[in-house]
């Protein structure tokens, strides 16, 4: 009798627990607060909305419901690591840290825990070497790709040669902003252009000294690795010194409406790289509406 009770108890527990075990857990390490909130909110909303769509339209993935576990990082590396530690035990399938600094810290942890990291267009560029970093995936592009593409565009604008030209890199003074430096230094040596490095401290509202230096040195091109308010301030400062906007090129994290609208018409001509098609003229948006 005791054996039968044990079997029935175990079966009852299994049926009670199995729906929970069947959930597909996707952690959302988002930042809706802090100085980068205006950039973090749209991504966090879109991430959650897409999984809501999959649940309501398709019944989840492969018949399994999706659960999004939210954790606020405020774009702070320490908080990001705390979010990882507090959510990985929920059966998290993949992490998107949304921060190069957080990504660097999570790479060894995720490898030890066998949990993939998807850092689309950010994070540790060398992580694309799958022989070394088996749990990191950073498609569709890296910051080394971006540095090369921006340089190629500047070269095309200069008639095929950058020899004797000056390029200034205005960058967020963080792991993210420093990612393209070694690539640009190598390209500078290869193509014989002069590279100047102008770091901007977090959050990026104060840039007077950097733009005074730009005004003094008169670079032919400016590349920007910015984020948040830093972008709009830089574009406005470029307009203030009448820098030719067509020669001002931002990475893909420096090309949203939030970045250009504050400068108004003065932003016309400014360019940024892109790793996705803009707009909402795609079938998935019809389903979400």
Predicted segments with their positions:
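Signal peptide-proximal N-terminal region
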Residues: 45-68, 160-162, 189-192
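Sec/Tat signal peptide C-region and signal peptidase I cleavage site
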Residues: 17-22
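Bacterial N-terminal signal peptides that target proteins for export
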Residues: 1-10
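Beta-alpha junction/loop-to-helix N-cap segments that form part of ligand/metal-binding clefts
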Residues: 25, 38-45, 57-129, 139, ...
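Short, well-ordered beta-strand elements
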Residues: 23-31, 66-70, 165-169
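Periplasmic-binding protein-like
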Residues: 87-100, 118-120, 166-171, 197, ...
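Extracellular/periplasmic periplasmic-binding protein-like sensory domains
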Residues: 238-289
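Extracellular/periplasmic Venus flytrap/periplasmic-binding protein
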Residues: 125-126, 134-241, 279-287
